[in-house]
Amino acid sequence: TQQLVKNVTGDNQNTVKRKVMEIYRAQELEKRYEKDEILEAYLNEVYFGYSCYGVVTASLKYFNKDVSELSLAECASLIAITNNPSLYDPLQTDWGLENNRTRQLLVLGAMLEQEKIDQAAYDAAKEENVVFSNGYTILGGRVDVDTDKKDDTDTDGGDEQPEEETETATSSQSY
């Protein structure tokens, strides 16, 4: 809750006054909202790198999928990024990919320990081959999908058929 308050207010001063205000605001939020609502708000505000704010843009950036299509392993990999987007970035470097995997396993382990998932779900997620995709560009939290598609409107009166949509080249990494 305090992290949500910090993200929303944008106050990054390292002062006692800021911290006290953050605690107070967090307590006020917890009086008004359920934990699930606070978590949802946090997940829609948290930074994932590449100008991605929120899980919706992050799922498109890192997996080229809608957030509703993510597996447990992919969700844990995204959550891993929030701790330190530069350190746990699976797309930048091999060590970022390795760091993300280590953190993903830590997230899954915490979920198992807190009984948010069972052993079978943990084992399946741990064994899943997670493939990261870099097929989308996120600009300012908005998704910019690059596709080449000819206009369906025939302006010269010919019998030319519209070209089929071509996919943009993507790069990917996996563990």
Model-identified regions with their sequence ranges:
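Non-catalytic, structured segments within soluble enzyme domains
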Residues: 1-175
